[in-house]
Regions:
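Hydrophobic/aromatic-enriched cytosolic interaction surfaces used to assemble or bind macromolecules
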Residues: 1-165
């Protein structure tokens, strides 16, 4: 699989998805298309499929965790490390834990409401899409040392802090 189908979901259920194909170097192959997510199904055959999720539905965090070994123990520790910073009950949230940077105790985490995740899963299951990866829009904004990076996209301002990677 040298090409990747990138599908961007919108915050509004009524808004169409948009997608494009990129080659192994990240160069666009063709134009951005939009419509119902099912329309992207034919393009997913033989390609890696990546979803870009609305930043408004995904909270990104980097909690400092004590040295804990094993994915299961880390998954148990993360919600409690973030509990006081979240407005929702922990059982209503899904926590996707990234890889710890060897030079830090911070652990990248993406948090999404379980109901929202289930809605997305139903949408891509109904369309026959099998994603290989999913990223929050805001996690795709590049960072720069000692500077904020701001991206204005269709009325939404995305911000990448200097310490965000």
């Amino acid at each position: 699989m040298t090409e990747t189908l990138v599908i961007r979901l919108r915050a509004s259920e009524d808004a169409p998805a948009s997608w494009l194909i990129v080659d192994a170097n990240g160069a666009r192959s063709g134009n951005v298309q939009s419509g119902p997510i099912a329309d992207a199904l034919a393009l997913s055959q033989g390609r890696r499929t990546v979803l870009v999720l609305p930043a408004s539905d995904v909270t990104l965090a980097r909690p400092d965790l004590p040295p804990v070994r094993g994915a299961a123990r880390i998954a148990q520790a993360v919600p409690f490390a973030l509990e006081e910073h979240l407005a929702s009950d922990l059982e209503n949230l899904h926590f996707a834990v990234g890889h710890r940077d060897a030079s830090s105790s911070a652990m990248p985490v993406a948090i999404v409401a379980r109901a929202t995740l289930e809605r997305w899963q139903a949408m891509w299951d109904a369309a026959g899409i099998r994603p290989d990866a999913a990223y929050a829009e805001s996690s795709l904004i590049p960072s720069a040392p000692n500077a904020l990076v701001l991206v204005l996209d269709e009325g939404t301002l995305h911000v990448s802090r200097p310490d965000q990677s």
